[in-house]
Amino acid sequence: MPIRILTPIRALLAALLITMAPALPALADTLVFGGTRGIGLETVRLLAGKGEAVTVLVRETSDLTALNEIDGVSTTVGDAMDRASVTRAFAAGEYQVVVSTLGGSMTAGFTVDSVGNINAIDGAKAAGVKRFVLVTSIGAGDSRAAAPAPMLKALNQVLVEKEKAERHLIDSGLQWTIIRPGFLNDKPRDTQGILTQKSSAMGAISRAEVARLITESIGNEATFGMIYSAIEE
């Protein structure tokens, strides 16, 4: 299923189907940050299912139960919050793609949304990795007005931190794509997710569908240098 991308004009008329235009080898080694749970884990499942070589950065305390159930996935131990640790992770392999779905929590704080992602971005650049897909959230950057007031009140700080990471990636010189999901749920992929450039877009989307959009964006040159909101069609 090709990515469905809505531009501001096309969004008023119809969904625009963009044919995949791979700029990377069919099997591109991918390093995933945030791959032990949520969107990251779903992304790892899809990439591994396609035969991609996937490595996930994991902490010593990470629960690897779900990852261990996926064939062909490698892990490297490190901490995204530790710059030296991230450097070692990149040195441990020859990666062509980085996907980061890092995010904090109410209990652990949200600095990983900025510092962790920035470390991943800098590590990729230093290692010569060109392709970087970053997952943040609707409400960050120019999509702030799309987020409902209760969401802004509850997640204001996390959105600020995510925007710092977005700005850093935009200025990095990498071949980047930023995907901002709306309200996340764990429904199966029974509804079509879309990528839209409308910064005013808001809606729900399953983690599994966000993962599909990520994997289909990786080699699609049309998504390079673009910021999208991800919602159900």
Describe the residue ranges of each PLM region.
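Sec/Tat signal peptide C-region and signal peptidase I cleavage site
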Residues: 22-28
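N-terminal Rossmann NAD(P)H-binding glycine-rich loop of SDR-like oxidoreductase domains
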Residues: 30-50
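N-terminal Rossmann-fold cofactor-binding loop
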Residues: 57-62, 80
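Conserved Rossmann-fold cofactor-binding substructure of NAD(P)-dependent oxidoreductases
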Residues: 74-96
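NAD(P)-cofactor binding segment of oxidoreductase domains
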Residues: 96-132, 163-164
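Substrate-positioning beta->alpha
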Residues: 116, 179, 201-216, 226
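Conserved beta-loop-beta element that borders a ligand/cofactor-binding pocket
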Residues: 166-188
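Glycine/proline-rich active-site loop of Rossmann-fold NAD(P)-dependent oxidoreductases
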Residues: 188-193, 217-226
